[in-house]
Design a protein with these regions (language model features):
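Membrane-interfacial loop-to-transmembrane alpha-helix junctions, especially the N-terminal start
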Residues: 13-16, 124, 207-208, 314-318, ...
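Transmembrane-helix signature of polytopic, membrane-embedded enzymes
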Residues: 14-18, 91, 112-134, 305-317, ...
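Transmembrane-lumen/periplasm boundary regions of multi-pass, lipid-linked membrane glycan transferases
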Residues: 43, 51-56, 69-75, 79, ...
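Loop-to-helix entry region of an early transmembrane alpha helix in multi-pass inner-membrane enzymes
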Residues: 71, 75, 79, 87-110, ...
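Transmembrane-helix motifs of polytopic, lipid-linked glycan transferases
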Residues: 99-119, 157, 161, 295-298
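Hydrophobic/aromatic-rich transmembrane helices and adjacent perimembrane loops
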Residues: 141, 148-156, 329-341, 423-432, ...
Length: 654
């Protein structure tokens, strides 16, 4: 009779479960409050077109900006939004998108907690998780951002699962004890001993066979890297086939495939061969050494164990999960290869030489997932992915509003990210990051056992920051492109939180301190809703002080509130002009309203919606009056203008 309450009590004793349950309830409660971003409709259409490619449609390949990023998450939120709309018809599909984004944010919250446990005890870990989950910047983006929020979620999930896989493989593989470099040298000595022992135990015939195979593989690599004999041989054979002078089997095969070969010049076939050779050359350069290792391990007993060539390593489920998440992360943004690098470093640190084979599986599976979920790559995967990486590294500069002026993202000052992080996180979070940095350095000075974990945190934040400062990595719209670094900063804040909790002797003092830490964020969530992502802290005077100095509602989600006001007051069939993206208004506008953009003259409109960050204008001279402002404090996000009625003509003199 008391089984269910007892289970509920046990469940409630897990703070992260309570946090996630509360988060899910909040997502259901608030999921249909948010406006659409200006690129949400375009990305939803791209996801729908990508889904159709699996049934043979070519629509996706006719869209623009395909090298920017893959559509895996766009496909996912298309599916979930339609399912949510069918379950709750009052929610338009745009609200289904926002609910899906919130689930990705909850995944981030869970993974943040799991990662925090590596740096602090359970109590400060879940307290730090509350601090993370109630950051208005993250909470707001968790509902509206269809690129940076899922990227952050997949990034941290890939890292957490990859580190878990490395720990499991460490326990199974039993690498040499000791610190990293001495243990690595010991593994190398073991490998050399296996090779000497195995070689001496081989018969002369097997030695010759092994040496011949390895020599052949080495010559093939040398040819691919430098000589180019295979490339020239292929061109000669193709030319002979084209002339009809090839050996009969090859000639018959070619004739059966290319029945009208004479209609195509030889140069066209040679160009296709060149493209094919370029496509397979790079994979072969990675594959041939692996084949050599596998062959040598089959001949030399024990060698395979030194580099992880073992079934127990290949059967680790967390490794495959992390590989899937890596592939999905790269598909969302090419920068996802960075998390693969972090996981690889940790796997090497934990298992040393035994990491080689698991890493081959990890990267191969991740590449397969990226390829399978990014149709743009299908015609020429390696070349197109490298082009996409280059495009991302040289992403065109955008204008961003910073410190009261517009500037190119390429010439933003070096302190662009640190300053925005300091004013977009809550005051307690900023203070705790500073305290946590000092506490982490103090810990490392006293005990270097966890230096590698702290080093990963430093790389997580430091590498993107270096990309901004030294390599002109594009960032605009405040720090939304760097949201994925904030979990690392807030883990440092958690370290600071733990350092303070250790000095509090009373449980009530701990709870009071936690309330002081969390309440600024919670209050901002309530006051700013549904525009939490515009949050600025008191260092710049809140959103009122930041207005006119920093970007606030760049995504113009406040257009929803304005069009809903029009829905209530406008007559049937009036014309509404949207200064911005009409797609952000369409899901919420009355069906009878005629929507136009600013390519039409103002005289065509009865109402005008103006989102301030991109169009600060005065429509009074055009015969309009302001009747509604979407605002928080002194910050005006969107203006609603209505055409003034025409003055009556003066009556004629009798």
């Amino acid at each position: 009779m008391f089984e269910l309450p007892q289970r509920a009590l046990e469940w409630s004793r897990s703070p992260i479960r309570v946090i996630l349950l509360v988060g899910l309830i909040v997502a259901i409660w608030l999921g249909n409050d948010y406006g659409a971003t200006f690129d949400e409709g375009r990305n939803a259409n791209k996801g729908a077109a990508a889904l159709r490619t699996y049934s043979g449609s070519k629509d996706y390949f006719e869209l623009d900006a395909l090298p920017d990023h893959g559509p895996i998450y766009f496909m996912f939120f298309n599916i979930t939004a339609k399912a949510i709309h069918s379950l709750a018809p009052s929610w338009p599909e745009a609200d289904g998108h926002h609910f899906t984004h919130s689930l990705m944010f909850l995944l981030t919250v869970y993974c943040f907690y799991r990662l925090s446990l590596r740096f602090m005890g359970p109590r400060p870990a879940w307290m730090a998780t509350i601090l993370f989950a109630t950051q208005p910047l993250l909470f707001g983006n968790g509902f509206i951002n269809q690129k940076d929020t899922p990227f952050m979620a997949l990034f941290i999930a890939a890292l957490v699962s990859g580190m878990a896989a490395a720990d499991r493989l460490h326990r199974r593989g039993q690498p040499s004890p000791g610190t990293f470099l001495p243990a690595l040298l010991n593994d190398l000595r073991d490998a050399a001993a296996y090779i000497r022992t195995g070689w001496s135990g081989l018969s002369r015939r097997r030695r010759a066979l092994l040496a011949g195979i390895l020599l052949l593989l080495g010559l093939l690599m040398l040819d691919l890297l430098w000589i180019g004999l295979l490339r020239g041989l292929g061109e000669s054979v193709l030319a002979a086939i084209y002339r009809g002078a090839a050996p009969p089997p090859l000639q018959r095969l070619f004739d059966s495939v290319a029945t009208d070969a004479y209609k195509t010049p030889l140069e066209a076939y040679l160009a296709k061969y060149e493209a094919f050779y370029t496509e397979v050359r790079l994979p072969l350069l990675f594959l041939l050494p692996l084949v050599g290792l596998v062959v040598a391990s089959r001949f030399l007993p024990g060698l395979g164990q030194t580099w992880g060539f073992d079934r127990i390593f290949a059967a680790e489920p967390m490794l495959w999960m992390s590989a899937f998440l890596l592939g999905a992360t790269v598909c969302v943004r090419q920068l996802g290869v960075f998390v693969g690098g972090l996981v690889s470093l940790y796997l090497l640190y934990r298992t040393r030489l035994k990491a080689i084979f698991p890493l081959v599986l990890y990267w191969a599976a991740g590449a397969a997932v990226t390829y399978a979920t990014w149709p743009y790559l299908w015609p020429n995967p390696i070349r197109r992915f490298l082009e996409s990486l280059f495009f991302a590294a040289q992403f065109p500069p955008h204008h961003t509003f910073f410190e009261g002026r517009w500037m190119s993202s390429r010439i933003a000052p070096w302190y662009y990210f640190p300053k925005l992080a300091a004013i977009e996180l809550t005051e307690p979070a900023v203070l705790l990051v500073l305290i946590g940095t000092a506490a982490a350095l103090w810990r490392l000075r006293r005990d270097r056992a966890n230096w590698f974990l702290y080093g990963l945190l430093a790389l997580w934040v430091g590498v993107p920051f270096a990309g901004l400062v030294f390599f002109d990595m594009t960032a605009y719209g405040n720090i939304r492109h760097l949201l994925f670094t904030l979990p690392a900063l807030l883990i440092v804040a958690g370290i600071g939180l733990e350092a303070i909790l250790q000095r509090l002797r009373r449980r009530w003092a701990e709870w009071l301190f936690m309330a002081v830490v969390a309440l600024p964020g919670i209050w901002a969530l309530i006051w700013l809703h549904p525009y939490e992502y515009i949050y600025m802290n008191s260092l710049v005077g809140g959103v009122s002080g930041a207005y006119g100095r920093y970007e606030l509602d760049r995504q113009c989600i406040s257009l929803r509130e304005a069009i809903e006001e029009v829905n209530q007051i406008a007559a049937q069939g009036v014309t509404v002009m949207v200064l911005g993206q009409i797609s952000a208004v369409v899901p919420y506008a009355r069906p009878d309203l005629r929507l136009i953009d600013d390519r039409e003259p103002f005289r065509s409109a009865d109402y005008v919606l103006s989102c301030y960050w991109q169009s600060t204008i005065d429509l009074g001279p055009e015969g309009f009056e302001t009747i509604y402002k979407v605002r928080r404090g002194e910050a005006v996000l969107t203006d609603l203008w209505r055409r003034l009625p025409l003055a009556p003509l003066p009556s004629a003199e009798p």
